[in-house]
Amino acid sequence: MAKNTEAQKTITVEQIGSPIRRPAVQRQTLIGLGLNKMHRVRTLEDTPSVRGMIRAVQHLVRVVDEK
């Protein structure tokens, strides 16, 4: 197997919308991203699964930084 010599890419997201009155699936997605309160910021690995979770709640989060 080939070793991954690249540095791990990260993506920083901030919660800008409230999960109140949102479907349970969207609330669970925010929890999966490590976000549960307004204006919380998390730095996550930049993987396809994380990108998909961000896309599912794009109206509730903002991408702050990509490295």
Swiss-Prot record:
Presence of keyword Nucleotidyltransferase: no
A GO biological-process term: translation
Keyword Ribonucleoprotein found: yes
GO molecular function: structural constituent of ribosome
GO cellular component, one term: cytosolic large ribosomal subunit
Superkingdom classification of source: Bacteria
Annotated keywords: Ribonucleoprotein, Ribosomal protein
Protein family according to the UniProt entry: Belongs to the universal ribosomal protein uL30 family.
NCBIfam families membership: rpmD_bact (TIGR01308)
Subunit composition and interactions: Part of the 50S ribosomal subunit.
Name the record gives this protein: Large ribosomal subunit protein uL30
Lineage of producing organism: Bacteria, Pseudomonadati, Pseudomonadota, Alphaproteobacteria, Hyphomicrobiales
